[in-house]
A protein has these predicted regions:
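N-terminal Lys/Arg-rich, disordered targeting/topogenic segments
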Residues: 1-11
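Hydrophobic membrane-insertion alpha-helices, especially the h-region
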Residues: 11-32
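Alpha-helical transmembrane signal-anchor/signal-peptide segments
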Residues: 32-53
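Short, flexible loop segments at the rims of nucleotide/cofactor-binding pockets, characterized by
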Residues: 40-45, 67-68, 94-98, 240-241
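Short extracytoplasmic
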Residues: 48-76
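A short, well-structured juxtamembrane/interface segment
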Residues: 49-55, 244-251
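Membrane-embedded segments
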Residues: 67, 71-158
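Secreted/periplasmic serine-hydrolase-like ester/acetyl group-modifying domain
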Residues: 138-250
Length: 251
């Protein structure tokens, strides 16, 4: 009887191990697929180019850096600013950059350069957030400093976000579903001859230029005014400066 009980328990454990292996393999495959979709994001490509070129610069050849979100890297153009101020500047903004990330961007800059001036772009809608995984991951994708990345995760990530970060399907799900939805729509249109509802023509262009700057003169279509309007239903009395972001700005 004890032997039968042992065999039964062993079979149960074996089944559990096999199940976990299958789940692990499937999870890894899904994660790789999701990451591949994220790699096709053109905004990520601009960020990658911005940082790749920064790492190629001669040490201590940059005396001013711009740090912030897309508001920064689409606004402060070193090609215009440097001839006027006599500076040698670089744009190091990243999409949706929060100020915990700004702090670590500057720490990485100081490993290679000794800028005399640092221009930090502030945006009210980001100042109220405690943490945002996607913007942190965008920075990690271009950061060539594992110890700094580990320090960021240890000091900034809430516990539940540390778990999510190590699971690719969760980390990259936003990129994947945005990419996949577009692919599915295109295939349906081609297969069934379905005509999608006409959307306003996008006026303007966006491209990476130089020294971290991204040129963008795209005009927002009218149909997006309500969808992306951050001031819609906004009451300034309810706005609060998040303590986490405040802490990193004060640093």
């Amino acid at each position: 009887m004890p032997e039968n009980s042992f065999i039964s328990n062993f079979k149960t454990i074996l089944k559990l191990v096999v199940f976990l292996i299958i789940v692990g393999v499937a999870f890894n495959k899904i994660g790789a697929k999701y990451k591949a979709a994220a790699d096709k994001n053109i905004i990520n490509a601009f960020t990658q180019q911005r940082y790749n070129e920064f790492y190629e610069q001669e040490p201590n050849s940059i005396d001013m850096v711009f740090i912030g979100s897309s508001h920064s890297y689409c606004t402060f153009d070193p090609e215009i600013i440097d001839p006027i101020l006599g500076t040698s500047s670089w744009q190091l903004g990243t999409p949706l950059q929060h100020y915990d990330t700004s702090y670590y961007v500057l720490k990485e800059v100081l490993n290679y350069q000794k800028p005399k001036k640092v221009v930090l772009e502030l945006y009210w809608d980001i100042l109220k957030d405690e943490f945002e995984m996607k913007q942190a991951n965008t920075f990690f994708e271009v950061l060539k400093n594992q110890s700094l990345k580990d320090e960021y995760i240890k000091n900034v990530f809430p516990l539940n976000e540390k778990v999510k970060y190590n699971l690719f399907p969760i980390r990259y799900q936003q990129d994947y579903f945005a990419y996949e939805a577009n692919e599915i729509q295109t295939k349906i249109e081609e297969k069934y001859g379905v005509e999608k509802k006409a959307t306003p023509e996008i006026v303007g262009t966006e491209y990476y230029r130089s020294r971290g700057y991204t040129f963008c003169d795209v005009v927002m279509p009218e149909n997006e005014y309500n969808e992306t309007n951050q001031f819609k239903n906004f009451d300034g009395e309810d706005w609060e400066f998040n303590n986490v972001q405040k802490k990193y700005i004060k640093k």
